[in-house]
Amino acid sequence: MSARGKRIIRLLSLFWIPLTWILLTGCVGQFETKPALTATCNIPWHLAAGFPERDAPPPTQNQDLHVLIWNIHDRVLPGSMFASDAHTEEEVVCIGDLASRYDLVLFQEAFVRPAPLARYTGHMWANHPVFTEGGGGDWWPLRWMCEICLSPGLLMMAREAPTWVYAEPYQAFAGWNTDENKADDFFSKGFQLVQFPRFWVLNSHMDAGRGQDSIDARLLQFQQITAGLKRLVPSDAPLLIGMDANLRPEIEAQDQKILEEFLQSNGLTLIHQNGPDIIAARHLHTDHPRTLSLKGVLSDHHALSVFISQPPAPN
């Protein structure tokens, strides 16, 4: 390359890197730096969810645990380039008000406010993994420009402390967004696996597109979960799985096959499904699975809930 060509490339890089940084931080923002949520929730979410009172659902009364699974779509902060897609602080407080009523919470797309949201709900324990490698959001210069792009957006909160916590980035993802193959912009993907004293819990969020690249990526992601479960979790251990699987088995035969193979390979029973969101379990008694109709109220997804009975304590 000539000296003139090299100078042109250097000049372009001087403009391209700052421009890319501005676009990325403007599009997806950064983690919320405000330490606490101070707004008040005045949105009547409890009516949309089917609860007659704002303080519902009632706290758990016996040994059962009440579990909430929800893609909360908290992806950008107000003031970013795509702020029309951003939650207000009041909406996040409403999400926290609902989550605070549950013993165990599995959130997806908790990208920008995981820490203040976890503090707000008052759960004893919370975990929000961030990957340093893998998952799709770790390439340079993205990792330098966008701190939340290394996050899979998974937030788990519980009233009891776990005995072991693990997270693993996915090796497969659909890549750049197109009309049919979506990797949720630049964010990473992976799963969160937690061992509590009497049972295990897995939380995840899979690729979102409808195209073949996304279908293939989801297949490999589910296979990676299966490999992780067989490697890390005893086959007779009680296990709860809650996730935004981004499967639509009712309209896509390949998705149906992926789901069936995943359930069969891991000895799981599908407890509840609404759209792309699922609850599955093995060696656990579950009761009253339901959908909370919060899509269009506090998120672009409905929430799922279920009661699980505490298994006997291991000897």
Could you say what each language-model-derived stretch is?
Residues 25-26:
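C-terminal motif of bacterial Sec signal peptides marking the signal peptidase cleavage site
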Residues 29-55, 229-240, 246-315:
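Metal-dependent phosphoester-hydrolase catalytic domains
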Residues 35-59, 104-198, 288, 292-295:
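Structured beta-strand-rich core segments of catalytic domains in phosphoester-bond hydrolases
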Residues 90, 94-97, 152, 217-220, ...:
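Extracytoplasmic/secreted proteins, especially bacterial periplasmic and envelope-associated proteins
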